[in-house]
């Protein structure tokens, strides 16, 4: 018997944050342990806007939205931990950017036939 597939965490995070605009999401680490029915994915969220203040506000809004994920049963997210940030980290060309890193734990669910 195989464990059910785990949800795509990057996709879950992106779907929640995409309407904020100026958001990029990528996983930089992941891990699962026996019996492989849950996984924790480390996600980095880069937040861009036209000014430092707008970027700051958007980053903290993104943080709040991610912390609400475990309370949405449809999300399959069991836990969100802030790993670092939001922190000011402008692009090399000086463009405004805040970076937020979170650990998102998900659980696989078998579909009932």
Protein language model features and the residues they cover:
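Charged, amphipathic alpha-helical segments and their flanking helix caps
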Residues: 1-23, 27-113
